[in-house]
């Protein structure tokens, strides 16, 4: 039995999702009395220049590099068992060895497909449990290694795919993808309507435009949607200040029809009152939407995990996938007018959702390492003016 385990969570800043999952797991461990938790961006610390370049290319995949990313994602999948596996296994290895020597963790968790730890286990024989927390509704071979002790996955579908390619079923646990605890709280929606100056008698369209310009023609879309009767449009621009300033001028022409925000800390509040949402199909965003049963319109998924996520939600009846700019307004307006379709999509989201995934993952890890959790009660946060 380990009395006070040290937990090392490895992640990477490719998008916010992997880091967000790492922080959610860190918070959950701490809530269960495990105080010694370290979150490390292994690639960023090991190779900062290469990491910055690849992060830039990753973001460009949303605009000009879609075919390149398609080739990378599906090409690596096909040839992964060859030379790339050997090169990738050693990426970050030097920094990892120093980290393991200095921190001496009892448990290692990956929220990004980092195989340096299991590869080090294979080559050196070190005894340390390794857990992979997959952050999409699909699986890439790069996540899989014989020295990983357990995988936590979003759905039974992902589990079946992994079993089909040789991962023992008993090593895979279907938990859902960890999301922020705020998405699992109960909040009176009237408070939210008042806070954001929204009308509960109108439908609300939430557009999550993001900081990297992943949604095109936002200004023109907003102008079109503002003409739809009994509809309020809410746009979250993230840290894209230029987009926010561009939309504020549109908002001023009819502030009741359009609400524009920058970064919204408690974005779950907007999820709770929206009729449907236009967004990109990241695994964490979709998990959060499922938790609050928000029908989603998925805009032009990037080939790779985003496209796989989108196709899964589309098959389940929880999403409308749009691949052409010219279809955005017409398909969104049609959905907003189809109450039966919206209800069916909400039910589909409900069927996808797995409650308290972070708690399930942490409890499983602690139990397997014979650690008795010491629950620390956390008060529900009050609604705050946490938007810009």
Swiss-Prot record:
Name of the protein this chain belongs to: Processive diacylglycerol beta-glucosyltransferase
Domain of life: Bacteria
Catalytic activity as recorded in UniProt: a 1,2-diacyl-3-O-(beta-D-glucopyranosyl)-sn-glycerol + UDP-alpha-D-glucose = a 1,2-diacyl-3-O-(beta-D-Glc-(1->6)-beta-D-Glc)-sn-glycerol + UDP + H(+); a 1,2-diacyl-3-O-(beta-D-Glc-(1->6)-beta-D-Glc)-sn-glycerol + UDP-alpha-D-glucose = a 1,2-diacyl-3-O-(beta-D-Glc-(1->6)-beta-D-Glc-(1->6)-beta-D-Glc)-sn-glycerol + UDP + H(+); a 1,2-diacyl-sn-glycerol + UDP-alpha-D-glucose = a 1,2-diacyl-3-O-(beta-D-glucopyranosyl)-sn-glycerol + UDP + H(+)
Keyword field: Carbohydrate metabolism, Cell membrane, Glycosyltransferase, Lipid biosynthesis, Lipid metabolism, Membrane, Transferase
Disulfide bonds, paired cysteine numbers: none
InterPro entries for the chain: Diacylglyc_glucosyltr_N, Glyco_trans_28_C, Glycosyltransf_28_UgtP, Pro_diacylglycrl_glcsylTrfase
Provenance organism: Bacillus cereus (strain 03BB102)
Enzyme Commission designation: 2.4.1.315
Recorded GO CC terms: plasma membrane
Pfam families per record: Glyco_tran_28_C (PF04101), MGDG_synth (PF06925)
Function: Processive glucosyltransferase involved in the biosynthesis of both the bilayer- and non-bilayer-forming membrane glucolipids. Is able to successively transfer up to three glucosyl residues to diacylglycerol (DAG), thereby catalyzing the formation of beta-monoglucosyl-DAG (3-O-(beta-D-glucopyranosyl)-1,2-diacyl-sn-glycerol), beta-diglucosyl-DAG (3-O-(beta-D-glucopyranosyl-beta-(1->6)-D-glucopyranosyl)-1,2-diacyl-sn-glycerol) and beta-triglucosyl-DAG (3-O-(beta-D-glucopyranosyl-beta-(1->6)-D-glucopyranosyl-beta-(1->6)-D-glucopyranosyl)-1,2-diacyl-sn-glycerol).
Pathway involvement of the protein, from the record: Glycolipid metabolism; diglucosyl-diacylglycerol biosynthesis
Family label: Belongs to the glycosyltransferase 28 family. UgtP subfamily.
């Amino acid at each position: 039995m380990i009395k006070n385990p040290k937990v090392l969570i490895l992640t990477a800043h490719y998008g916010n999702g992997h880091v967000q999952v790492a922080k959610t797991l860190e918070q959950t461990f701490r809530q269960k009395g495990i105080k010694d938790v370290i979150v490390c961006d292994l690639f960023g610390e090991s190779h900062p220049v290469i990491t910055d370049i690849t992060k830039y290319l990753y973001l460009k995949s949303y605009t000009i590099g879609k075919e390149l990313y398609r080739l990378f994602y599906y090409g690596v999948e096909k040839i992964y068992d060859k030379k790339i596996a050997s090169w990738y296994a050693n990426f970050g290895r030097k920094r990892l060895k120093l980290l393991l020597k200095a921190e001496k963790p009892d448990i290692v968790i990956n929220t990004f497909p980092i195989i340096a730890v299991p590869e080090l286990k294979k080559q050196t024989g070190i005894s340390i449990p390794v857990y992979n927390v997959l952050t999409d509704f699909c699986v890439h071979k790069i996540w899989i290694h014989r020295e990983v002790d357990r995988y936590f996955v979003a759905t039974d579908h992902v589990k079946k795919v992994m079993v089909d390619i040789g991962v023992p079923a008993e090593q895979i646990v279907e938990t859902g993808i960890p999301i922020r605890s705020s998405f699992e709280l109960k909040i009176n929606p009237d408070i939210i309507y008042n806070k954001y100056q929204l009308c509960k008698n109108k439908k609300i369209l939430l557009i999550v435009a993001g900081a990297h310009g992943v949604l095109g023609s936002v200004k023109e879309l907003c102008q079109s949607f503002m003409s739809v009767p009994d509809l309020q449009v809410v746009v979250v621009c993230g840290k894209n200040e230029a987009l926010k300033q561009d939309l504020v001028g549109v908002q001023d022409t009819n502030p009741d029809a359009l609400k524009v925000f920058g970064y919204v800390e408690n974005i779950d509040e907007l999820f709770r009152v929206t009729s449907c949402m236009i967004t990109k199909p990241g695994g964490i965003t979709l998990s959060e939407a499922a938790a609050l049963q928000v029908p989603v319109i998925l805009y032009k998924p990037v080939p790779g995990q985003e496209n796989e996520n989108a196709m899964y939600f589309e098959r389940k009846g929880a999403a409308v996938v749009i691949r052409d700019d010219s279809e955005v307004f017409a398909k969104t307006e049609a959905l907003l007018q189809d109450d039966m379709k919206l209800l069916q999509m909400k039910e589909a989201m409900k069927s996808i959702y797995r409650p308290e995934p972070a708690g399930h993952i942490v409890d499983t890890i602690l139990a397997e390492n014979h650690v008795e959790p010491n629950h620390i009660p956390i008060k529900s946060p009050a609604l705050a003016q946490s938007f810009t």
